[in-house]
């Protein structure tokens, strides 16, 4: 029965033209068969996942553009002559270059990197409490080349791997970083750095696919937050969703063939089997938010999935990032505008 139901869903999704005419909406970017997500949690129900530019309330949508909660189609094999399909609408825009291109002003969630690395993600904008400047936040290994950089080094957007060159794409200078201690008995809490834009008008307080960055709120995670919905936008996997799998984690992170570092009090993010991996290489530096868009932490590492285990993502708790770098979140009244 379950396999037959799944095949019915696949047949409907493959009928792309028929389905497009059915919903009469040119803002749809794609379809898939997945599990229904309700309140940020994956349910056991199969659903037609419909990717749209932006989810809007019914009152803001013309009648022909409204996607029904269920789709009913006549079928001779159904007992009552009708097959019913659940729908699940999600926001997603698919583009091969959007997150690795040069952008001015540069939003968060796109390619950036120290002149000597490959590329990571521009996490967000914060305030440097020492200078009062609005600065770019990302990882040490993205902006400071894993301790190898010098203060004042050029930061490129996009990162070198994505075609960024100096001086054409020089967007900021390295300001400060928290050194990563690779000693066997050391305990690290953050992989973090900041850079000051050459021109404040070249950055914007906005995260791709999420919108204006969160007001000055930080989500401190505890036991009650296990399973909490989170999301991020990164250079490689773009906008993804996941959930808090574990907290207060101690992990060993490999930086190259010879260097490993231990991190404590970390957050582990996973995702349901129906979802793509929460992160991949190049997403380092992404800011992770909860459903209220409160800051959860700074993404910096992860593991690949296997047949039996999902991929996982490691996140520095945001309170440690703010403390160690001596920075603070921007408030809604003082962000750079586009």
Segments and roles (model prediction):
Residues 57, 143, 318-321:
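A generic structural signal for short hydrophobic patches within well-formed alpha-helices
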Residues 34-37, 236, 302-304:
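Flexible, active-site-proximal loop/turn residues at the rims of small-molecule/cofactor binding pockets
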Residues 58-75, 206-217, 311-317:
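Surface-exposed flexible segments
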Residues 1-126:
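Noncatalytic regulatory segments and standalone regulatory/sensor domains
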Residues 269-270, 277-279, 289-338:
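C-terminal subregion of chymotrypsin/trypsin-like serine protease catalytic domains
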Residues 97-272, 276, 281, 289-292, ...:
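Serine endopeptidase catalytic core focused on the charge-relay Asp
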Residues 14-24, 69-83, 130-131, 182-186, ...:
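Intrinsically disordered, low-complexity coil segments
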